[in-house]
From Swiss-Prot:
The lineage of its organism: Bacteria, Bacillati, Cyanobacteriota, Cyanophyceae, Oscillatoriophycideae. CDD domains: UBA_EF-Ts (cd14275). This is Elongation factor Ts. Keywords: Cytoplasm, Elongation factor, Protein biosynthesis. It is found in: Cytoplasm. It comes from Trichodesmium erythraeum (strain IMS101).
Length: 219
């Protein structure tokens, strides 16, 4: 068993907000491993979730989802702050549901509006400003209309702004916040990719009779 030093106990106390004796016991139970001791304290309901606020969310799961028929596939990374939460069934269920959401949203390309490149936003603005239905509008009115249209367009492209497929009254962002509050630590979708069978490929059309003839060596 590793030696449980006063320095180690102090470090765990600062990280979790738990009492000295609880920290010492947690470290003994986990052979001096700080991360495992933190999980042990949280499992016992002793650690303060508030102490985790400044911790970077580097734990979590990468989930895959293949839609029925194998024509659509998704990979998504969802992060949390501790391995303890990453193993939680509620967290696992969230990640699975997010993957299914992405599969159901072909227009979604980004996690949030903040991820959309400035160049794209400026291009959309330029297109909207040049539309004929705005040509006779005063500049300030035109600007407001364009901002509204762009805002709507950007939300269509972002995962966080999508209505949750299992409850249309809430967005994915609200679902993430609810789960984060339930688990007591920060939860965030970091990245995802969506695959569609044959996407980007030009399907070659052929005459079935000619194809059979070619395969059998007949003309």
């Amino acid at each position: 068993m590793a030696e449980i030093s006063a320095k180690l106990v102090k470090e765990l106390r600062e990280k979790t907000g738990a009492g000295m004796m609880d920290c010492k016991k947690a470290l003994k139970e986990t052979d001096g491993n700080i991360d495992k001791a933190t999980d042990w304290l949280r499992q016992k309901g002793i650690a303060s979730a508030g102490k985790l606020e400044g911790k970077v969310a580097t734990e979590g799961l990468v989930e895959s989802y293949i839609h029925t028929g194998g024509r659509i596939g998704v990979l998504v990374e969802v992060n949390c702050q501790t391995d303890f939460v990453a193993r939680n069934e509620s967290f696992k269920e969230l990640v699975k549901n997010v993957a299914m959401q992405i599969a159901a949203c072909p227009q979604v390309e980004y996690v949030s509006v903040d991820d959309i490149p400035t160049e794209f936003v400026e291009s959309e603005k330029s297109i909207e400003m040049g539309r004929e239905d705005l040509s006779n509008k005063p500049e300030n009115i035109r600007e407001k209309i364009v901002q509204g249209r762009i805002g709507k367009r950007l939300k269509e492209l972002t995962l966080m702004d999508q209505p949750y497929i299992r409850d249309q009254n809430k967005t994915i962002e609200e679902l993430i916040k609810e789960t984060s509050a339930q688990l007591g630590e920060k939860v965030q979708v970091r990245r995802f990719i969506r695959f569609v069978l044959g996407e980007g490929l030009e399907k070659q059309e052929s005459n079935f009779a000619e194809e059979v003839a070619a395969q059998t060596g007949k003309k």
